[in-house]
A protein has these predicted regions:
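Conserved small/polar residues in nucleotide/adenosyl-binding loops
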Residues: 206-208
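Core alpha/beta nucleotide-donor-binding catalytic domains of modification enzymes
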Residues: 1-203
Length: 208
């Protein structure tokens, strides 16, 4: 019996229009979402499967970051995947706006890889919960109704495109899939911190 999540992912991937064997760059944090995305891509039928390469950034924000780096390095070696690694050194961390600065560093790194390698597609593991949070954050910040647009499943990025093939999947669905298939991943310790608007909204929504 085919796995429902894998069947649905195949349908979403087909919509992305990426040719089979096309090289794609997957942004991986070692969390549940990105490790599940990696697994789903590798389990695509051969006639649909892209050539996967991985981009990982150690942001030096968590005590477990060295373990995460070792984990993704060994994972890529075991699965024969090209891995691009970078470190955001602590000395460059700002005192305020660290989450946004980390994101900017990360995406500059992804863009540089694409420019240097000619890879056209960047994949991230944003899911439907991220989509809902983005719209809610804009509403909380006073956005007009017309401006309350969430995350797009595809957009131009650098010299290529940014694709989000998990955007129609819930966090719960991805976690259940990971458990069913014994996919190893790291919990993001920073999600337990209640000092960023997105995490505050997440905690509040989980309380109700």
């Amino acid at each position: 019996m085919k796995d429902k999540t894998e069947v649905e992912f195949q349908a979403e991937w087909k919509k992305m229009g990426v040719p089979a064997n096309e090289t794609v760059l997957v942004a991986v944090s070692t969390g549940c979402d990105s490790m599940t995305l990696l697994s789903l891509l590798q389990r695509l039928p051969e006639k649909m499967r892209p050539t996967v390469q991985v981009a990982y950034v150690d942001h030096q924000l968590r005590e477990q970051s060295k373990k995460e780096t070792d984990f993704i390095t060994k994972y890529c070696q075991k699965n024969g995947l090209v891995l691009f690694k970078n470190v955001w050194e602590k000395e460059f961390h700002p005192k305020k706006g660290i989450e946004e600065s980390a994101r900017e560093f990360r995406y500059r790194f992804f863009e540089k890889i694409m420019e240097e390698t000619g890879i056209e597609y960047l994949l991230t593991a944003h899911h439907s919960n991220d989509q809902a949070e983005t719209i809610l954050m804009k509403a909380v910040r006073g956005g007009d109704l017309e401006q309350l647009v969430g995350i797009k499943s595809a957009r131009t990025f650098g010299t290529g495109k940014l694709l989000r093939p998990l955007l129609h999947f819930s966090k719960e669905t991805l976690k259940e899939y990971a458990e069913r298939n014994q996919i190893k991943y790291f919990e993001d310790e920073t999600n337990a911190l209640d000092d960023v608007l997105r995490n505050r909204l997440r905690h509040r929504s989980e309380e109700h």
